[in-house]
């Protein structure tokens, strides 16, 4: 039984949002007007974003993000792992799930679907968001773009019961790769303290990586630098993105520039140069006392020779410790190497529903085939 009955309103533009939106979204930069305006002006080409306000009477009690993805307009899901199973998976997505609606942010890992006020009832908010997703699906159907799959993504396992209360019994509960998170220990007052806390094997890994990176120059890049190197930045990003086993979007060319314009000092861009040439970059977003890693790119030959990716991880940790962050969110993928620097897996759950009733009943089998469990060995690098 729901405690409250909330209403909702849909918005297509940031300038339409209620005045109280940013006050509510202060707990999560990824739901702030600043970040949402980035999505409004530089979302991936196959993505449309909508914003949802949940109200108790006239009071805004929750602020949410919805994303529509059209997988038909994507040139490639990814160019790695060319095999029959991958081809079948890609066919199934295009044929049966090409129009996907997310309540949440498909570009991030973690609970970035909505933020709610302290007095808001969680299950009642979910119920209102479910109703909003039905209305959005109806709007897309009238536009000739029927929604095949609705997904509420990246919630902590402790919230599963709240979804049941909110009437998600016909949704399939799923989990994919965990979110890799490094908790900053209170006794790490400097990066040297972090290194000292590592077992010898992992201290040696750090020393080897730093030795390999000899000759690389790391630079903090400002807006004018990002603009100057934008072509190379996009090439480096696409090299990494297209070599991923599966993609549902590719970033817009102006995405990093727009992030810097809208978020200012909360968006950090670091370039890695070899003999004056940009060969890699990493990005970070400050989210209160949490440091979120964002997208990166690199030249594969330099990455192998210089252990560039591992060095980026160490640099992110050094920044997080030196600036007093509580934790660093390393997100999904590359689970083993992230665990080798101390990140711990945090299981996330989601809920999905297919518009075809027969397919919806079989989602558990379909999901296990299309999203096989990742086999990896967790590392334990600390003393």
What label would you give each PLM region?
Residues 32-35, 77-79, 87-92, 139-140, ...:
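Glycine-rich loops and low-complexity Gly/Arg-rich segments
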Residues 39-42, 83-85, 93-99, 181-185, ...:
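Short C-terminal domain-edge/linker segments immediately following a structured domain
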